[in-house]
A protein has these predicted regions:
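Short, flexible loop/turn elements at secondary-structure junctions
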Residues: 1, 30-32, 131
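Mature N-terminal, pre-catalytic/accessory segment of carbohydrate-active enzymes
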Residues: 1-9
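Short secondary-structure boundary/capping segments
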Residues: 5, 35, 40-47
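Catalytic domains of carbohydrate-active enzymes, especially glycoside hydrolases
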Residues: 10-31
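Short, solvent-exposed turn/loop segments enriched in Gly/Ser/Thr/Pro and often Arg
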Residues: 27-37, 199
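Acidic, His- and aromatic-enriched active-site or binding-groove loops in soluble protein domains
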Residues: 43-65
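Active-site-proximal, well-structured secondary-structure segments within enzyme catalytic domains
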Residues: 66-192, 196
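Conserved small/polar residues in nucleotide/adenosyl-binding loops
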Residues: 197-203
């Protein structure tokens, strides 16, 4: 009901359907965050998950959002059509509220998630924060050559400090995505079903 399919009830219902039909494999398109053109095969990261797939009903159940906050957004009028421009605005508006409520509350779990994914998560979160800072333009068009080309430790730390709120946001969204994805994957395994995803063409 909120613009795009998610890792929520519909996914579990489909898993049950596969199980009832005697199927043991669910093949999916890449699950990474999409870039310009919204193709799942062109992603900002090989490792990150797409925040669009975070289920908002589960966030309501978890106390991170209210139903009024979710239903007040414009998700489009055609349930068969994904309006990526619209859900970009609407999703990040409500996901920001979820982060504002959950970042401190979930800090112990988030810290463990960060440690487990330290090889890619800090760079991804900083890259996305910088991309937002520079108007979502391609990194080749960023105004600051120091972050665009040289990426010295000092410059990276400068931008981590400057963009701390957005770095936290993109970190927390990955935490939420993988918490929901891992629960769905565990449910699939309980049904003796495995999921396969295609590889993406990463840009980071």
């Amino acid at each position: 009901p909120y613009g795009i399919g998610t890792l929520g009830k519909a996914a579990y219902d489909f898993a049950d359907f596969l199980h009832a039909a005697g199927q043991h494999c669910w093949q999916m398109l890449p699950l990474g965050p999409t870039s310009y053109g919204d193709s799942p095969y062109q992603s900002f990261s090989t490792y990150a998950g797409n925040p669009y797939f975070i289920d908002l009903e589960l966030l309501i159940e978890d106390g991170l959002l209210t139903r009024d906050e979710v239903e007040s957004q414009n998700w489009g009028t055609n349930p068969r059509y994904v309006d990526y421009g619209r859900i970009y605005e609407s999703r990040f508006a409500v996901l920001q509220k979820a982060k504002d409520r959950g970042w401190e509350r979930d800090q112990a779990e988030v810290a463990a998630f960060q440690a487990e994914n330290c090889r890619w998560l800090p760079d991804y979160a900083l890259y996305m924060a910088c991309k937002r800072h520079f108007g979502m333009r391609s990194w080749t068009e960023w105004d600051d050559a120091d972050i665009r080309l040289r990426r010295s430790p000092e410059v990276l730390e400068q931008y981590r400090t400057l963009l701390r709120e957005d770095v936290e946001l993109f970190t927390y969204l990955q935490f939420l995505f993988f918490r929901q994805w891992n629960r769905l994957r565990d449910y699939l395994h309980s049904l003796d079903t495995v999921s396969y995803t295609h590889l993406t063409l990463p840009t980071t």
